[in-house]
């Protein structure tokens, strides 16, 4: 199988490295310099060349030489590479490389041989990354407030896997808080209703009809045993059954989006196992938790504030504003304390952690990052990488007007209803068309609109157009072939140059933990494809199928097939199926 990681951009990073080795051997550069800041990437202005490197700029000072002088020596070495037409020095010492057309034709052939592996990377080095996402309270079906974080987290996990990481997709089940007791009481109301009582759901309970089947199931199993019983007799049972039913519903809802977690971790089980207590003892042993007094909250005066001794985590040592309590005065764990123990457990089995949170949790990012830094470095090691990605809410519209809420769900629009109406692929791609921390409108009419202003349609239409041309070519006796790629000129090679950026886009997106970059890249590639395709409207010689020229047709169909391959690969990373026809 072709090594898809040896793409042109990665290969030229090695070419630059070899040229620097030659300068070291010649004594032009000392052999002790770090090259970690050296880059090889397309210049912002394509007219400047195909690739650019900052090697002379970043190495000149530590080498004790002038950037342009070093650039001159490095350019001379780079021009020895057969695929380099010229190495031109720009500004204070950047080097712009112009490559032969055959270099790009070779990359096009590589896409063809690598197939679904084109763009795959080994940059992750098989390191284990735990990506925790969704983690919605198990109190009802998934709604569109959860959707964006679910898609961002799932796409990020798949992106990290494609870039060489081992990934754990985790869902943290918040089943130990007061909200699950409220759920149990709500289900008890539905249980009594199933027994024939007329009930009104009081303020503060969950009113959604989705709890009706849970109540019916309990009524069928237990009859009226718990109808008049004291809450203490049924609360734990009803809570357990209700949470299980809600998690089944949540798994089903997520499956409609193609999301399947590897691990579901229960907060209640974590606490019952004693692991939270063990984490506290570990923290105390490392002098990271102590018993102390909290400062009075802002707005409180000494007269109306009664200080209480609480176990406090030394988060100020790690950049937080103040030390944080891990337990309440009644001995119950604070949210922060439970999260602390949970992240402590996650860190035991992963090299890096990523959490996808709603933007409304922004205020707790600093303290949990401080906690993870402490937990993973207390024994003298380097803190494990930990990032929190914040996701803004989505406003649902229909033709520009806010969407009415769902009666079934009580007060929100369910995810399953949205997926049923517009489809999984539309939902997933749309959620990645903006940075996750930017506001987003999801308009039911616009996301299915057949328009170039709709990025979902625009990318899928490019792939469908390619498939249609390949089918048409086959019907007319033409097959894609790499035998005559020398027939492809500047306009076709411009497409190849853009497609060739896919592997480096994968690595950059993975490093930044930003899967939306793949969606942006696919939109750019689709736009370039449509522009070239449309040339054939007025110029028959620019069409993919030129009846009088079988060699050109075979080469262009090969080009189309590989552009389609890159689009498919990118969509697959995002969990979206490429459309064969529209």
From Swiss-Prot:
Subcellular location: Cytoplasm
GO cellular component terms, A-Z: cytoplasm
Pfam families (UniProt xref): Arg_tRNA_synt_N, DALR_1, tRNA-synt_1, tRNA-synt_1d
Record-level GO BP terms: arginyl-tRNA aminoacylation
Broad class of the protein's primary localization: cytoplasm
Residue ranges annotated as motif 'HIGH' region: 136-146
Keyword field contains Cytoplasm: yes
Superkingdom of the source species: Bacteria
InterPro entries the record matches: aa-tRNA-synth_I_CS (IPR001412), aa-tRNA-synth_Ia (IPR002300), Arg-tRNA-ligase (IPR001278), Arg-tRNA-synth_N (IPR005148), Arg-tRNA-synth_N_sf (IPR036695), ArgRS_core (IPR035684), DALR_anticod-bd (IPR008909), Rossmann-like_a/b/a_fold (IPR014729)
SUPFAM superfamilies in UniProt: Anticodon-binding domain of a subclass of class I aminoacyl-tRNA synthetases, Arginyl-tRNA synthetase (ArgRS), N-terminal 'additional' domain, Nucleotidylyl transferase
EC number(s) per entry: 6.1.1.19
Family named by the database record: Belongs to the class-I aminoacyl-tRNA synthetase family.
Oligomer and partners: Monomer.
PANTHER family per the UniProt record, alphabetical: ARGININE--TRNA LIGASE, CYTOPLASMIC, ARGINYL-TRNA SYNTHETASE
Official protein name in the record: Arginine--tRNA ligase
Protein encoded by which gene: argS
């Amino acid at each position: 199988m072709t090594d898809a990681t040896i793409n042109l951009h990665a290969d030229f990073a090695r070419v630059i490295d070899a040229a620097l080795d030659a300068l070291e051997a010649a004594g032009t550069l000392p052999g002790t310099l770090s090259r970690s800041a050296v880059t090889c990437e397309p210049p912002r202005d394509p007219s400047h060349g195909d690739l650019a490197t900052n090697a002379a700029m970043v190495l000149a000072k530590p080498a004790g030489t002038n950037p342009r002088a070093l650039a001159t020596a490095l350019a001379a070495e780079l021009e020895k590479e057969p695929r380099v037409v010229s190495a031109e020095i720009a500004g204070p010492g950047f080097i712009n490389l112009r490559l032969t057309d055959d270099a790009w034709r070779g990359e096009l052939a590589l896409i063809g041989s690598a197939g679904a592996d084109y763009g795959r990377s080994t940059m992750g080095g098989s390191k284990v990354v735990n990506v925790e996402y969704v983690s919605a309270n198990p109190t009802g079906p998934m709604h569109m407030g959860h959707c964006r974080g679910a898609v961002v987290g799932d796409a990020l996990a798949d992106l990290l896997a494609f870039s060489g990481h081992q990934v754990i997709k985790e869902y943290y089940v918040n089943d130990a808080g007061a909200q699950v007791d409220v759920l149990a009481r709500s289900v008890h109301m539905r249980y009594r209703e199933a027994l024939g009582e007329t009930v009104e759901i009081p303020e503060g309970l969950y009113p959604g009809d989705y709890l009706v089947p849970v109540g019916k199931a309990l009524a069928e199993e237990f009859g009226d045993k718990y109808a008049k019983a004291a809450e203490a007799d049924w609360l734990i049972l009803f809570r357990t059954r209700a949470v299980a039913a809600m998690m089944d519903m949540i798994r089903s809802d997520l499956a409609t989006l193609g999301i399947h977690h590897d691990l579901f971790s229960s907060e209640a089980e974590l606490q019952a196992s004693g692991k939270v207590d063990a984490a506290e003892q570990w923290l105390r042993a490392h002098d990271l938790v102590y018993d102390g007094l909290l400062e009075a909250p802002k707005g409180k005066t000494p007269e109306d504030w009664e200080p209480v001794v609480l176990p406090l985590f030394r988060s100020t040592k790690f950049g937080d504003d103040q030390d944080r309590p891990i337990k309440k005065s009644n001995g119950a764990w604070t949210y922060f304390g439970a999260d602390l123990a949970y992240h402590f457990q996650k860190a035991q089995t992963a090299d890096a952690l990523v959490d996808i949170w709603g933007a409304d949790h922004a205020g707790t990012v600093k303290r949990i990052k401080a906690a993870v830094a402490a937990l993973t470095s207390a024994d003298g090691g380097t803190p494990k990488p930990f990032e929190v990605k914040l996701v803004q809410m989505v406003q649902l519209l229909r033709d520009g007007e806010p969407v009415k809420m769902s009666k079934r769900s009580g007060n929100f629009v369910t995810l399953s209803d949205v997926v049923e109406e517009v489809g999984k692929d539309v939902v997933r791609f749309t959620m990645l068309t903006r940075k996750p921390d930017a506001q987003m409108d999801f308009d039911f009419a616009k996301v299915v609109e057949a328009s170039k202003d709709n990025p979902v349609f625009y990318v899928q239409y490019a792939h469908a157009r390619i498939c249609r041309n390949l089918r048409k070519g086959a019907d007319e006796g033409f097959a894609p072939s790499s035998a005559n790629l020398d027939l492809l000129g500047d306009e076709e090679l411009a497409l190849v140059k853009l497609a060739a950026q896919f592997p480096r886009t994968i690595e950059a997106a993975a490093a930044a933990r930003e899967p939306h970059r793949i969606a942006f890249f696919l939109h750019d590639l689709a736009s370039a494809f449509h522009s070239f395709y449309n040339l054939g409207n007025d110029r028959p010689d620019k069409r993919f199928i030129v009846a009088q020229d079988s060699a050109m047709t075979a080469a262009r169909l090969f080009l189309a097939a590989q552009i389609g391959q890159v689009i498919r690969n990118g969509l697959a990373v995002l969990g979206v199926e490429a459309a064969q026809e529209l």
